[in-house]
Each structure stands twice: as C-alpha cells, then as structure tokens.
Amino acid sequence: MSVLTTRAPAKINLTLHILGRRPGDGYHALESLVAFADVADTLELVPGPDLTLDISGPTAGPAGPLDDNLVLRAARHLAAGVDGLRLGAFRLHKQLPVAAGIGGGSSDAAAALRLLAELNGLALDYPAVIAAARATGADVPVCLDPRARMMRGAGEEIGPVLGLASLPAVLVNPGVPVSTAPVFKALGLAVGQQLDGAEHPVVGASLDADAVLGVIAPARNDLEAPALTVAPVIGEALGLLWAQAGCRLARMSGSGATVFAIFSDDGAAEMAAGAIRAAQPGWWVEPTRLA
C-alpha cells in the first residue's frame, strides 16, 4: 500500500470555562468551544511490520524524545486493543509550536489513530480507537475528527459537529513553552472546589461569523489570568493583537502561551500578522482561518 498522509491541525479553544475540580479524580471539569486552524503538522504512515517514528520540521527539536511522543503512545494503545493491527513507520513534519496551548501533540496523536484506522479499515468511532484516544490524552478525542464542537467533562465528553463559519484569524506564540500543570497550579483550585463565573453561552448548531463572535465575546478562558502569572509575555502578545486594525477579539488558547485574534477579514489578518512579525521577528505568527 502507498504512503498514507493526514494533517494534524492546531486546536484552538475559542472559549474555556473551568467549572471546578472533580471530587473523584481531581481532574478539572471544563466547557470549551473548540475550533481548528488551517495551520497544521503533517503525518505520514508507511505500512510495515513495526511502529517507528521520525520527526522533522522547524519545531522538531522541542518535540521531545521519540519514544515518549504521543504519536507512538496512541499507536501502542490502539495496537494493544486490536489483535493483529497492521502497523508501520510514521513520519511527522512539525510546524506547530510545542507546549503551546493549541493541542499540537494531541492532534498528532489523533492523526496517528486516523491513519492506523484507515490502514486497518476501522471507523473513527470504533470502540478501540476511542479508547486509545482517551488513554493517550484528554485533548486527543476531540482531535480525532477535527471540526468545531463543544468539549465537556475533563475533555472526554465530545459534542456533535457544529456548523461554525470560517473565521479569519491570526495565531501568535511568543516562543515560551508553557506546561499545563503550572497554570492549573496557579489557578489554585482544591479537589472538589467549584469556580464561580457566568455559565457558558448556548452554542447553536450553525453560526455565521457574527453569531460566533456573539457567543465567544461574553465567554472567557479561565486559564488566561493564571497563565499570565506563569508567562507574562502572553499579555504582551495579546496587547499586540488588540492593537491591530480589524481585530474583533483576542484571547489565549488552552493553557497558553499561544494567543489568537479574530479579524474582520483575511486582508486585515494578513496585515496584522505582518506587523507583529516585524515587531517580534522571533515569535511564531500565522494568519489562518478557524472553523
């Protein structure tokens, strides 16, 4: 069989409400409207007898040890759940920043499961595929079918696909990796403690651009404030986005440090990206669309 290829797009939390810490397992309960960007890593699978991984690309270095990569972790979980699973050699081209709040590793893992499912004739809702996604990480299930939807629970509860309009946007990462654990520590919730805040807005099944802004503008990312204490440069990145002509909303994604802004049109997004690159040439800046 020829090489199988898929994209692993950046996952953007348009909203991220933390409801509290669950008393049973201590995980943080959340509600989040998730969309996906045009920018992505690329993953290939060459069918073969063994599971292997090769990583290249501009952000390959920070991706960490090969043997601990989420691509192989997801593949091993699936192999453990499916007798006789056909395997192969993965080739990952890393374009997305690592530890950046955009689910790069989770999206890569989900891409690996998609390719193995394709190779083995498995549906994405096949129980072993879902189980492997959940075992690999909280963000992996929503990345299996990378289209806009709501996440709830600790990330394991995935809502139906939503018809969100494609939004002109800019993603900015100031080059500072931010691990999730210190951000949750800064949030400071004890097990069983609830976080006060307005309820998440109701999200309709189909929304044009103005309706999407109407939903997300009054919402929030509850991890933004604690992340600013961990990496204050996030605030600088947000300020640069808000200062650009045509910016309709700027917010942090996930636990940071990537921030995003929704713009009035693609031209405004392109101009904003150019201005921010000129001001901060060492930052990762990408005009894109979110849907």
UniProtKB/Swiss-Prot annotation:
Q: Which UniProt keywords apply?
A: ATP-binding, Isoprene biosynthesis, Kinase, Nucleotide-binding, Transferase
The record ties this protein, via Gene3D superfamilies, to:
3.30.230.10, GHMP kinase, C-terminal domain (3.30.70.890)
Please name the pathway: Isoprenoid biosynthesis; isopentenyl diphosphate biosynthesis via DXP pathway; isopentenyl diphosphate from 1-deoxy-D-xylulose 5-phosphate: step 3/6
Q: Where, by residue number, does ATP bind?
A: P97, V98, A99, A100, G101, I102, G103, G104, G105, S106, S107
Give this protein's Gene Ontology molecular function annotations: 4-(cytidine 5'-diphospho)-2-C-methyl-D-erythritol kinase activity; ATP binding
Q: Which Pfam families match?
A: GHMP_kinases_C, GHMP_kinases_N
List the active site.
K11, D139
This protein's name: 4-diphosphocytidyl-2-C-methyl-D-erythritol kinase
**Species of the source:** Methylorubrum extorquens (strain PA1)
